[in-house]
Regions:
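Membrane-proximal alpha-helical signals and transmembrane carboxylates
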Residues: 2-374
């Protein structure tokens, strides 16, 4: 009994000692942290080959109904690297910058080059930054875009996230690129990453996203127009809600495309594994949403042929333009590399063949109605 009594006392002392050496909390209180909703990267003005980092910080408020609009603070700092600038920003505030909820990274248009991996490396290495964060280009600057607060932006929300998330805006003119996807495509041979380009109006109270940028090693990145961005989305990402304007003589048709699918295969050159052509087949389904003349459902096959011919010309023109500029946003080269037996000169052979490859495009438009009731 005496032994059991000593054992019990030993357990009590051991438990008390363990409680004394425990920390009160492993994390900082929520009121000691500032949550960054977006971050912008611009070329530094006062630091040679440096960067200007701007963070958009969400300010807390009591209740959503007590706030008429979102409340944000903006902090900026220049540094030789992204990490250095962010560390210096922490000396400007009395709290800790929390990056775990950040979903949008905005990069100045002039920084969208192949060497952007040197500063994007910071976001990949930090464990608290989500790899599913959206990455976009900015014009005229990332700081300007971050400070735009649209009138449609609701309290406790960030408009930038709604543009790229599938839960809100689903426009076919908006390209969505994730951080992990950008990193993967930059390091891969045979594909050029494509990022959305965010702009603003003259008043600075609206965000406009209907252009995109093809990332390449050039000093001035290639910007895709609104129409070219739509073609890219419809072919590669099978976006819905597309519209195509078809003209023949005095007849004008506006097609509302609800489904789009592209398949292609390489046509090899005789006696060589290098492709001489790309045989591409595109199927689109939709209805006629608008017309300047009366339409008849009996002529639906005629409208299909007319639409197929017009859409083919538009898409072929876009593909040839990308080829002439030696850009490959669709990743034809990457597909070729990954479906062939590896050799040291495989990608070199593709680079030599790509400028002369012929695009054989077949478009099949299947209109399901004229949008009218007879």
């Amino acid at each position: 009994l005496k032994f059991l009594s000593l054992g019990k006392w030993f357990l009590v002392v051991l438990c008390i000692s363990g409680m004394l050496i425990q920390y009160g909390c492993a994390f900082k209180d929520i009121d000691k942290r500032l949550f960054v909703s977006a971050i912008g990267i611009d070329p530094a003005e006062n630091v040679e080959n440096g960067y200007k980092v701007t963070v958009k910080v969400a300010l807390p408020f009591g209740a959503i109904k007590d706030s008429a609009k979102p409340s944000f603070a903006y902090l900026s700092r220049e540094g030789h690297s992204i990490g250095e600038a962010i560390r210096m920003l922490e000396t400007h505030i009395d709290k800790v910058l929390e990056l775990g909820h950040m979903k949008t990274i905005i990069v100045h248009e002039k920084l969208l080059r192949n060497d952007m991996q040197t500063f994007m490396d910071y976001f990949i290495r930090r464990g608290d930054i989500q790899l599913i964060s959206y990455v976009a280009g900015a014009r005229p600057s990332a700081e300007t875009i971050l400070k735009v607060e649209p009138k449609t932006e609701a309290p406790a929300s960030v408009a930038l996230i709604n543009f790229f998330g599938a839960t809100a805006n689903d426009s076919p003119y908006v390209v969505t690129t994730f951080l992990f996807q950008l990193r993967r495509d930059i390091l891969a041979d045979g594909i050029n990453p494509v990022l959305p380009l965010i702009e603003t109006n003259e008043k600075g109270d609206e965000l406009i996203v209907n252009h995109s940028v093809v990332v390449d090693g050039r000093e001035d990145p290639t910007v895709l127009s609104t129409i070219e961005t739509k073609y890219f989305n419809s072919l590669l990402k099978n976006s819905t809600g597309l519209t195509y304007l078809v003209k023949k003589g005095s007849l004008e048709l506006l097609l509302n495309i609800s489904q789009s699918e592209m398949t292609y295969q390489f046509v090899p050159r005789e006696g060589s594994g290098v492709p001489r052509a790309i045989d591409m087949h595109i199927v689109m389904k939709g209805i006629i949403g608008e017309s300047n003349k009366d339409l008849s459902i009996a002529k639906l096959d005629e409208y299909n042929r007319l639409a197929s011919k017009e859409v083919k010309q538009k898409i072929l023109h876009f593909l040839i333009k990308m080829q002439e500029e030696n850009l490959d946003p669709f990743g034809f080269g990457l597909h070729f590399r990954t479906t062939r037996l590896y050799t040291e000169d495989l990608f070199t052979a593709w680079q030599k063949a790509y400028p002369d490859i012929e695009f054989k495009v077949t478009v099949e438009v299947k209109l399901q109605g004229t949008g009218t009731i007879e």
